[in-house]
């Protein structure tokens, strides 16, 4: 508990304040010395947690002397930032700022063991800095108690709309009924302070007397008698010349006429007696008697009542100043300790290398990375399944190829110069079509010897290196639908049966015929007829159903290949395909039914394959980024790779067909 230990005289401007002492300004005529005790650091060993103390000592030993001195230093900005967050009372914040400035300017040690330098830096004394036990007590024992006091201050507001505490509100400045407040402040005063409080100035007492007479509306005669009693008390009038004077009323009072002071007896009982006479005045009621002073002794009692009022107001003012200053000092002390504690913990965590908060965030980021990797694996697995389903067909029956050289032919759309539809590499007009397994002719059976990427089954279009040869009719829906395949004549002509046929008609063949075919070599495809005319001839489109087509095996139908003469410029195969379907009759449905199954036309299959390839085989940005990170030198050596591929392709073509290389020299380059 704080105590009032001394009085600062006006002549003592450079009063030697000791540790934990600070001036307390009561009014213009009274200034006392307020001293704080240091018993807050003297705690019992039972109140200290030994385990936490050992941990704190280990952290304290981690810091070097230079690091410890840096940790025990905080700026005023850090203190004031915490001040605005913790204290809702405006009066408390202003008092804390005033006390901080006062300590910084005067250099008093009111916050010992804390000190404020001239530059506004808050530091801790060297004795506490090096002692780990004292530092732990200051940070975690005293700080927790002060935190509870601050919570009590925040709850001690006068109202919901009023954020001021009880010591800075306007209501507390009004004197209340005489209670224990004056006793509390009287007990913490030293004898010197009590004598100073009991010393009443005559002019101040006269002012209180005038207010009292005006409040109770004394008559003129009574006012004169009260003034005469006051003059007797101050020594201006000789009491022996006044009739009806009672000396017992002024017992315990002594006046100093030359200095204009009135001295009261400093005994507690006498002070209580004087304050007791003023209690009805503050309680709101008074004894039922005439407010007149007909005699001098009654006038003396009125003067004594005014003296009690003046003394109580003075004690109440001292009590209010004392409590407010103690609260201000505690708040500033706690804010400084809390700022130092945070600075110490931050420095310790820096020495360790990583803070607890950073470790927490690091764990969260690691968990997020694990989740992202799982999601990425799921996406890659899903993409692989889609690519596999779009590229792979059911396992075909293997047969011996008629042309052994075609086994090593790479898939693609490259054609030789002998075919007018040939497209060179530099033209970049090659179209790649991908068809799903379930959409390819809606058939579960595949002709023997056909692979998913085989160029032999080209659906009526040539896509192999032997581009000069016309495409075969094997697996062609158009050829079968138009009656070109002539599968119904297979029984009459065995040589025709050994040739190519579409997949749907192939399903009707017996197992014996299949076994027989495996022993024979495959015939070469018969080329389509190309007319050397300037205009393209349209293919007659049979509007009859598929059943009627197969029912007329003897009907001869000519199928013209949509290719141009050498006089026309070269155009991509997709252009001829569009011309082919544009000339067909729009009234005929493009959906055919074979053996009770619904099969789409070639145009629909090609259109769907283009859409599916764009949707399913699209390369994502993640794949592009991963490729760039893995093969960083790819773009740098791209031209070298390109030239190497050209040379390898030349060697491959030379090995397959030397005569073909001579005709395709321009296309390869």
Curated annotation (Swiss-Prot):
It is found in: Cytoplasm. Residues 376-388 have a biased composition (Basic residues). Residues 398-408 have a biased composition (Polar residues). GO terms for cellular component: cytoplasm. InterPro entries: GGNBP2. GO terms for biological process: cell differentiation; spermatogenesis. It comes from the Eukaryota. Keywords: Cytoplasm, Developmental protein, Differentiation, Spermatogenesis. Residues 375-421, 452-475 are annotated as: Disordered. PANTHER family: GAMETOGENETIN-BINDING PROTEIN 2. May be involved in spermatogenesis. This is Gametogenetin-binding protein 2. The lineage of its organism: Eukaryota, Metazoa, Chordata, Craniata, Vertebrata. The gene is ggnbp2.
């Amino acid at each position: 508990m704080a105590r009032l230990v001394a009085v600062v005289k006006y002549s003592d401007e450079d009063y030697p304040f000791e540790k934990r002492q600070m001036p307390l300004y009561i009014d213009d005529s009274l200034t006392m010395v307020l001293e704080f005790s240091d018993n807050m650091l003297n705690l019992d060993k039972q109140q200290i947690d030994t385990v936490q103390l050992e941990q704190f000592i280990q952290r304290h030993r981690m810091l070097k002397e230079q690091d410890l001195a840096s940790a025990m230093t905080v700026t005023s900005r850090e203190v004031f930032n915490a001040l605005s967050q913790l204290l809702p009372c405006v009066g408390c914040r202003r008092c804390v700022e005033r006390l901080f400035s006062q300590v910084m300017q005067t250099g008093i040690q009111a916050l010992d063991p804390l000190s404020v330098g001239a530059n506004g830096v808050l530091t801790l004394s060297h004795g506490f800095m090096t002692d780990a036990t004292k530092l732990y007590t200051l940070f975690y024992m005293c700080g927790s108690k002060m935190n509870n006091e601050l919570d009590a201050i925040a709850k001690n507001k006068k109202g919901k709309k009023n954020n001021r505490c009880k010591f800075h509100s306007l209501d507390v400045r009004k004197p209340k009924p005489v209670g224990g407040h004056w006793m509390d402040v009287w007990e913490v005063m030293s004898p010197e302070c009590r004598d100073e409080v009991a010393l009443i100035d005559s002019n101040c007492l006269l002012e209180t007397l005038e207010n009292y007479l005006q409040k109770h509306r004394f008559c003129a005669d009574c006012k004169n008698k009260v003034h005469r009693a006051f003059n007797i008390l101050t020594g201006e009038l000789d009491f022996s010349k006044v009739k009806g004077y009672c000396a017992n009323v002024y017992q315990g009072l002594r006046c100093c006429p030359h200095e204009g002071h009135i001295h009261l007896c400093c005994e507690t009982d006498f002070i209580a007696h004087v304050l007791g006479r003023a209690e009805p005045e503050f309680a709101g009621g008074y004894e039922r008697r005439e407010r007149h002073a007909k005699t001098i002794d009654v006038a003396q009692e009125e003067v004594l009542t005014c003296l009690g009022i003046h003394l109580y107001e003075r004690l109440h003012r001292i009590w209010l100043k004392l409590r407010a200053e103690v609260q201000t000092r505690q708040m500033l002390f706690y804010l400084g300790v809390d700022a130092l504690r945070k600075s110490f913990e931050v420095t310790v965590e820096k020495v360790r290398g990583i803070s607890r908060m950073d470790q927490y965030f690091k764990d969260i980021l690691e968990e997020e990375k694990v989740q992202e990797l799982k999601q990425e694996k799921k996406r890659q697995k899903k993409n692989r399944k889609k690519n596999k389903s779009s590229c792979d067909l059911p396992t075909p029956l293997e047969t011996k190829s008629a042309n052994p050289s075609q086994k090593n032919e790479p898939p693609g759309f490259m054609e030789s110069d002998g075919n007018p539809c040939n497209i060179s590499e530099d033209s970049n007009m090659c179209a790649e079509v991908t068809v799903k397994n379930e959409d390819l002719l809606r058939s579960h059976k595949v002709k023997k010897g056909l692979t998913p990427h085989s160029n032999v089954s080209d659906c009526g279009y040539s896509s192999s290196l032997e581009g000069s040869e016309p495409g075969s009719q094997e697996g062609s829906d158009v050829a079968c639908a138009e009656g070109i395949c002539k599968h119904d004549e297979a029984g009459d002509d065995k040589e025709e049966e050994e040739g190519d046929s579409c997949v749907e008609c192939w399903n009707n063949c017996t197992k014996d015929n299949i076994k027989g075919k495996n022993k024979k070599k495959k015939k070469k495809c018969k080329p389509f007829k190309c007319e050397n005319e300037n205009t393209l001839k349209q293919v007659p489109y049979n509007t009859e159903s598929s059943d009627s087509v197969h029912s007329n095996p003897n009907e001869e139908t000519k199928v013209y290949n949509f290719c141009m003469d050498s006089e026309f410029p070269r155009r991509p195969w997709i252009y001829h395909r569009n011309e082919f379907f544009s000339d067909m009759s729009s009234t005929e449905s493009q959906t055919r039914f074979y053996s009770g199954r619904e099969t789409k036309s070639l145009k629909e299959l090609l259109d769907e394959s283009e859409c599916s390839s764009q949707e399913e085989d699209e390369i994502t940005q993640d794949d592009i980024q991963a490729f760039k990170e893995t093969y960083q030198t790819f773009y740098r050596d791209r031209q070298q790779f390109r030239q190497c591929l050209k040379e390898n392709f030349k060697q491959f073509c030379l090995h397959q067909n030397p005569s073909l290389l001579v005709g395709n020299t321009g296309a390869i380059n």
